[in-house]
């Protein structure tokens, strides 16, 4: 599973249209469609009912919150890394990763 596929899935959930979701993601519609086919193959079933309109299947509804969380956690990790990149090199010492440290990076659970 690739982050790109997750982002496309989430855009398609919001747009409910392959062309608009592809435009939003800055890719061609066939590229988005192929990514969704690959994700469906990996997850073992259809994520969307494609006719007459785009709606989530039972599997799509089941995986949506997990994929949303993955995308959010990736955003938190990216923000934490960017913040650390702005810290002076002398302050970038290795530290043990403890539960409190994980929570400060935006991880819940």
Regions found by a protein language model. Give the residues of each.
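Alpha-helical linker/hinge and terminal dimerization helices associated
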Residues: 42-43, 63-87
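Short alpha-helical
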Residues: 34, 55, 100
């Amino acid at each position: 599973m690739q982050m790109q596929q997750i982002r496309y899935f989430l855009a398609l959930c919001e747009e409910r249209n392959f062309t608009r979701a592809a435009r939003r993601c800055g890719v061609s519609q066939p590229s988005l469609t192929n990514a969704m086919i690959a994700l469906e193959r990996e997850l073992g079933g259809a994520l969307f009912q494609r006719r007459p309109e785009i709606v989530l299947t039972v599997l799509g509804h089941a995986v949506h919150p997990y994929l949303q969380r993955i995308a959010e956690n990736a955003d938190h990790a990216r923000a934490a890394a960017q913040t650390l990149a702005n810290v002076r090199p002398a302050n970038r010492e290795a530290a043990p990763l403890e539960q409190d440290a994980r929570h400060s990076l935006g991880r819940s659970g």
